[in-house]
Amino acid sequence: MNHFLKYSFSFFCLLACSACNDDGIDILDIEIPEGYALSAGTSTIFLNSSVAYDTPADWITGAYDVRFTRGDRLYDDVRTSNNGHGGGLGPVYAGYSCGSCHRNAGRTKPSLWTEGGSGSYGFSSMLVYISRKNGAFFQDYGRVLHDQAIYGVQPEGKLSVEYTYETFSFPDGEAYTLCKPNYTISEWYAEEIKPEDLFCTVRIPLRHVGMGQMMALDPVEIEALAAKSNYPEYGISGRCNYITERGVRSLGLSGNKAQHADLTVELGFSSDMGVTNSRYPEEICEGQIQVNQGSMMGLSYDQLDVSTEEMENVDLYMQSLGVPARRNVNDPQVIKGCLLYTSPSP
């Protein structure tokens, strides 16, 4: 990972490279203007295709390339509800593979937009977080509402959304429209939760490309950058998020609002797909009626659904994805946007 650290600061700075729109350009062929850096140093790749996010960095060779391919396969393979290899889906879940929500290591269009809520084809490319208004969890439910389930098992609930559209104007008079989502959860498997008692957050999938570079950064460097990110005139104060996992206090690096110290691929398999592993060996619906319903449908809970080696391969796959270079950097409109982005506000 040391070759990542050399370029770590560039991940937090203005990133650019000279124009290159043709696939297959080698990093040594690129002239980097003074004061700029490639998006991910030696992990920068030059692809504009639909698989640009799902391509290994050029330094992935030999045994690492084999493991990358295996991890990629596990990431994309559809899990089934059988008890053999590739099984373990459910009893409740949100998606049936990592790739169902993170297509080509990017984002799948959420069923929130395509179907107005929970998906009707066995997966919902979104996560529905539920809690009490004070942040506590509800009895009979966890932090995520699992709105999908295998055949014969009852989902925890179903989400629907309606949008309210409002029109506003910029100072120069140009109009724009914002839509406000209004969420409703129905078909609760246990006691119905009243809307006035419920805090619901719906999150669309994250892109996974570039996370390897975040993992490679020196925590001291991140803390130093956060210390500089204070803008009292705007009411902004940058700070790191520290978390405690398994009794160890660490700097949060991944997940929504940096709630995890690593890529937590095991949590994704467990919470999103119901696939048990050595880090999360219990079913995500442990203690709920869905466990018994799953048993009646033939599920066995006597073994882990994926091995530690398989999880390590998925982790390596995500850590070593190449990061596409910025495109169209010499386009006049892009240059204007870059200047606006980096200029102090009036």
Describe every region a protein language model picked out.
Residues 315-330:
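His/Cys-centered metal/cofactor-coordination and adjacent catalytic loops
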Residues 68-78, 100, 334-340:
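Extended, hydrophobic/aromatic-rich amphipathic alpha-helical segments that build helical scaffolds
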Residues 88-92, 330-335, 339:
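A glycine-rich, coil/turn loop motif that links secondary-structure elements
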Residues 341-346:
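Conserved small/polar residues in nucleotide/adenosyl-binding loops
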Residues 1-42:
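Bacterial Sec-dependent N-terminal signal peptides
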